[in-house]
Design a protein with these regions (language model features):
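Positively charged n-region of N-terminal signal peptides that target proteins for export
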Residues: 1-5, 19-20
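Sec-dependent N-terminal signal peptides
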Residues: 6-10
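C-terminal motif of bacterial Sec signal peptides marking the signal peptidase cleavage site
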Residues: 14-17
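Surface-exposed, beta-sheet-biased, low-hydrophobicity segments with strongly acidic/polar composition
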Residues: 22-379
Length: 379
């Protein structure tokens, strides 16, 4: 059920044989690495493109970028994974803070509300197979906005500020630059970013984050206001500023990233993975289609709107978390391999329906971090 996809000559043949809808004009260019420009709005109220072959700018075997893709415009936004620290939920009915789970951050609740108390490093607050999911040190990779251990590591921010505790935060790692062997990835070889103590409180509907180094007896603060146009507001503590990461919530559908997931070995532990694909929980739905390697491509070609029940809510009823694609499109045991028995159906926030399958996860040299996928508008 698996095959190595190491031959870009095959991709070239496929490109040459595509229909007019998938010809060279629809082979989408990569943006400059690290671009953070917001996507431009479409002049049409209902946006759609026919699709094509797509190369997300993941950035190679260190996978330095989070890449957000709008299928309806063909635009992507690539942002360096270590450019942000915390993200603040913009839901008008909730107050949640998430860690940067793309650089192995972790957090432990302390039994104090005094941010100026001196704290010590706790080496157990890490991402890895020694850290059980039940400890609640990381955010749920499924995107659940409930309290840990099945939701966010930082508890929901209360209106009663005396209920908002200080957290000991392992700030994770800078994106590394070490070049791994061909076919491998190097995701956490960068410099450790140290430790912080952090407390988040509320001022009306705004967030206020208090933060300091562990031994400091004074702290800094930032106030974060929600944006109705976005899922989250992101901040960088070192700069003391907000930073642009996700595009507006209506302007991306899927994202390629490295991130902390759960793994059963045999208990459920935290584990860091590359080549992960998530989808936007605000309006996007995904369904995985499992077939077999002999018929997958024929079934993909034949799949149309009617096959997807015209995108009904019932058809997408299992799309309840952001990891429907996740890592289910590839396998890395014995080398970088695609699973050639699956494809995916995606409904974007405008109601457009797409089918998507993966064509490669490596470049012509066999290096990971260069995925290619094909997607087509359902008709």
């Amino acid at each position: 059920m698996k095959k190595h996809i190491l031959f870009y000559s095959l991709i070239a043949i496929i490109f040459a044989s595509c229909s007019k809808d998938n010809n060279e004009t629809n082979i989408l260019e990569k943006p400059k690495e690290g671009t953070e420009e917001p996507l431009k709005p479409s002049p049409n109220s209902v946006k759609s493109v026919n699709g094509g072959f797509y190369k997300p700018n993941v950035g190679g075997p260190n996978q330095p970028n989070q890449v957000f893709i709008d299928l309806s415009t063909g635009e992507q936004t690539a942002v360096k994974r270590d450019s942000w620290d915390f993200a603040f939920l913009c839901d008008p009915k909730d107050h949640r803070v998430i860690l940067n789970n793309t650089i192995k951050m972790a957090a432990k609740k302390l039994e104090t509300t005094n941010i100026d108390e001196v704290q010590d490093i706790d080496e157990s607050v890490v991402v890895g197979p020694s850290t059980a999911q039940t400890l609640g040190y990381v955010d749920s990779p499924y995107g659940a906005f409930v309290n840990s251990p099945t939701g966010t590591a930082i508890k929901k921010i209360s209106e009663k500020n005396d209920e908002n505790k200080v957290y000991l935060v392992n700030m994770g790692y800078d994106v590394g630059v070490k070049t791994p062997e061909i076919g491998a990835i190097s995701l956490d070889e960068g410099i450790h970013r140290g430790w912080k103590k952090v407390r988040v409180i509320r001022n009306g509907d705004d967030y206020v984050i208090q933060y300091a180094n562990l031994r400091d007896k004074t702290h800094k603060t930032m106030t974060i206001k929600k944006k109705t146009t976005h899922n989250f507001v992101y901040i960088n503590l070192e700069k003391g500023t907000e930073v642009e990461v996700q595009p507006e919530k209506t302007k991306w559908d899927i994202s390629f990233t490295a991130m902390t997931l759960y793994r059963n070995i045999p208990q459920t532990v935290t584990y860091f993975f590359g080549d992960v694909v998530i989808h936007n929980l605000r309006g996007v739905k995904v369904k995985k289609i499992v077939t077999n390697s002999q018929t997958r491509d024929r079934e993909y070609d034949a799949f149309n709107k009617l096959s997807a029940d015209n995108g009904s809510n019932e058809y997408f009823k299992e799309s309840k978390h952001q990891l429907i694609i996740g890592t289910t499109w590839r396998n890395t045991q014995g080398g970088a391999q695609l699973l050639d028995n699956v494809f995916y159906i995606i409904r974007d926030g405008d109601g457009n329906l797409y089918k998507l399958k993966f064509a490669s996860m490596v470049n012509e040299k066999g290096e990971r971090g260069y995925p290619v996928f094909q997607y087509d508008l359902l008709k």
